[in-house]
């Protein structure tokens, strides 16, 4: 029997956003009117149930874990500007309600200072959950984790090998992630990074050399790597519930 590991941050946000409705209060002939934005929590519940029922049917998984990000984030301790670009974005009205409902009804899972991606990565690569695990997310960052994946939007299963997972990690170190507000190595976009990493054996050495070639230090490379890396079982202290910062290879 397989357990589905769900990126519930995405589920809660998508449901909360999709249930918002703007209403114009006034007659068509009125010069001015009042606009309000509302969301019905019952609509949220219906959509959440539909989403999880569809997941279970499509994946044939009966067991589900819904991972959520903690309010605190260890990456912000490394780099205070991490995800700072998101602070001014308005959150959907019922986001908190959706999180709480999923936590209560779909085996919510949260750990101090970790993001949902980290929780999925740790659970997928450890024996905390017995049997087969399937990572369910649309987030490309989780391609850093070896194992079986399911994209709920495309409704596709795909596998990631350990070698592919490691490559995807080093790739992310160089290109950075504008969405999460860390820059990687200057001048390294997708094409240049793929060419640079192609057919290389010691990818971490390649990454460090790229940073040095841009006038940066090995410490700069390590900082970007720690921001980019999705935690695996080897990156987590289970006893003390603390992330183990990546130190290079």
Regions found by a protein language model. Name each.
Residues 54, 73, 78-79, 92-95:
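Conserved phosphate/metal-binding and DNA-contacting active-site motifs used
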Residues 19-21, 73-85, 230-233:
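A short secondary-structure junction motif
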């Amino acid at each position: 029997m397989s357990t589905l590991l769900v990126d519930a941050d995405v589920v809660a946000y998508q449901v909360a956003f999709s249930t918002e409705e703007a209403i114009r209060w006034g007659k068509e002939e009125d010069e001015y009117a009042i606009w309000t934005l509302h969301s019905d929590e019952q609509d949220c519940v219906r959509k959440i149930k539909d989403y999880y029922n569809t997941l279970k049917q499509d994946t044939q998984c009966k067991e589900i874990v819904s991972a959520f990000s903690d309010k605190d984030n260890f990456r912000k301790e490394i780099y205070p500007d991490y995800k700072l670009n998101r602070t001014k974005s308005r959150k959907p009205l019922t986001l908190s309600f959706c999180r709480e409902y999923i936590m209560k009804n779909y085996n919510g899972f949260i750990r101090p200072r970790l993001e949902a991606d980290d929780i999925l990565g740790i659970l997928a690569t450890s024996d905390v959950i017995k049997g087969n695990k399937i990572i369910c997310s649309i987030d490309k960052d989780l391609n850093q984790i070896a194992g079986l994946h399911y994209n709920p939007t495309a409704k596709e299963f795909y596998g990631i090998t350990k070698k592919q997972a490691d490559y995807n990690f080093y790739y992310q170190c160089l290109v950075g992630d504008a969405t999460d507000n860390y820059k990687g190595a200057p001048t390294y976009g997708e094409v240049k990074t793929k060419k640079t990493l192609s057919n290389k054996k010691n990818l971490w050495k390649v990454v460090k050399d790229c940073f040095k070639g841009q006038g940066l230090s090995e410490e700069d490379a390590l900082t970007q790597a720690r921001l980019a890396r999705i935690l695996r079982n080897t990156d987590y202290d289970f006893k003390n519930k603390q992330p183990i910062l990546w130190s290079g290879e």
